Curated annotation (Swiss-Prot):
Keywords: Ubl conjugation pathway. The keyword Zinc-finger does not apply. Pathway: Protein modification; protein ubiquitination. It comes from Arabidopsis thaliana (Mouse-ear cress). Residues 4-51 form the F-box domain. Part of a SCF (ASK-cullin-F-box) protein ligase complex. This is F-box protein At4g35733. Component of SCF(ASK-cullin-F-box) E3 ubiquitin ligase complexes, which may mediate the ubiquitination and subsequent proteasomal degradation of target proteins. The keyword ATP-binding does not apply.
Length: 358
């Protein structure tokens, strides 16, 4: 029989390392309540510098409107009951503008959720940050803020990169409020569908599915890997969108394809499936990922990432969650079917505080 761990005997260096990974006052309170040694190791007024730097709002130089704009961070959290940590919910929060409170957002979009009137005792829950996303907003009439609704916004070190609505990549230095936005492009390729900061490097995805590397020192852009990802379905369906997703440490490319349907005399473009590709380093080509195993992809409007399905209520493994026409839908890679979340009888990981709507 193995010996029980004596928490008070853990070395101070390890406790300090653990404390530096905390991101909220609630986590700090729970950490310090374990034993006297833990309380002595970390002050109750500890600042979360890394978290604050990553999550703070930043004033940016004016974009096309000529009006003041800012970087607006949001974070995805996994919330579980401390008494039952095996399964949980996915929520999305950002700092409120005029107070120290948090504002609840719809998980798969940035729409604000009005207060439900519920009060949660956070000491009964364990909250873990799992992913970060960003938006760029501008100030207009009556001090109201609005989003530019860029296709993607990424913070890499102190540089803000965006893919605008015309599929152009721009960047500015968030530390210099008078820094002008600079366009990133190649002589041959000027339009892109996505960008990502992955393992310390900045990558861009062009409209053909080719990956490009962006230098953070010179801001040049260079092709990385094969010239494109497969497009073997283009004779039947239109590739509606292409996105990066980090999956098991690899950078995958997700193709979302659609088809036009005529409903009530109106042509409607609807998603009919997804294909996932990853780089085969030996073959130096992209190969299709037929199964996500026990993972699921979350394709939010401002960020895409993978989760371990069994850690969330009602989350189906080997599936892709996305939004369409103000509904949350799930695509199953196993049989290629698409289901509305509102039609599901299962408890949803998005339903902790809100209905399963965008």
């Amino acid at each position: 029989m193995s010996e029980a761990t004596v928490w008070s005997d853990l070395p101070g260096e390890l406790l300090d390392h653990i404390a530096n990974g905390l991101f909220s006052k609630v986590e700090l309170l729970r950490f310090r309540s374990i034993c006297k040694t833990f309380r002595s190791a970390v002050d109750s007024d500890k600042n979360f510098l890394d978290h604050l730097k990553r999550n703070r709002r930043r004033l940016l130089s004016p974009y096309s409107t000529g009006k003041t704009c800012s970087l607006s961070p949001a974070a995805f959290y996994r919330v579980v009951l401390s008494s039952y940590p095996d399964k949980g919910w996915l929520i999305k929060l950002q700092d409120a503008y005029v107070s120290s409170q948090k504002q609840l957002l719809s998980p798969l979009s940035r729409f604000s959720i009005k207060s439900s009137g519920k009060t949660l005792d956070l000491l009964e829950f364990t909250v873990s940050e799992i992913h970060q996303s960003y938006d760029v907003e501008y100030l207009y009439y009556n001090s109201t803020r609005a989003s530019f609704n860029f296709a993607r916004v990424v913070l890499a070190e102190d540089f803000v990169f965006i893919v605008d609505n015309y599929k152009k990549i721009w960047l500015c230095n968030s530390n210099e409020s008078d820094s002008h936005w600079v366009r990133i492009m190649d002589e041959e390729v000027k339009l892109f569908s996505d960008i990502v900061f992955h393992k310390g490097y900045m990558y861009a995805l062009d409209l053909t599915g080719a990956v490009w590397w962006i230098s953070l020192s010179e801001f040049g852009i260079f092709q990385f890997g094969p010239s494109s990802t497969p497009m073997d379905y283009c004779d039947i369906d239109e590739c509606k969108d292409k996105r990066f997703v980090e999956y098991c440490g690899d950078l995958c490319i997700v193709h979302r394809f659609s088809r036009k349907f005529r409903i009530k005399r109106v042509d409607i473009d609807m998603t009919v499936g997804f294909k996932v590709y990853k780089m085969d380093e030996e073959l130096v080509e992209y190969v299709e990922v037929k199964s996500l195993g026990d993972k699921a992809f979350v394709m939010a409007t401002d960020s895409c990432f993978s989760v371990l399905a069994r850690e969330y209520y009602g989350c189906l493994e080997n599936s892709i969650y996305f939004t369409e026409q103000n509904n949350v839908k799930v695509f199953k890679l196993g049989d290629g079917s698409i289901t509305n979340m509102v039609d599901s009888s299962f408890q949803s990981c998005f339903q902790m505080l809100i209905p399963p709507l965008v």
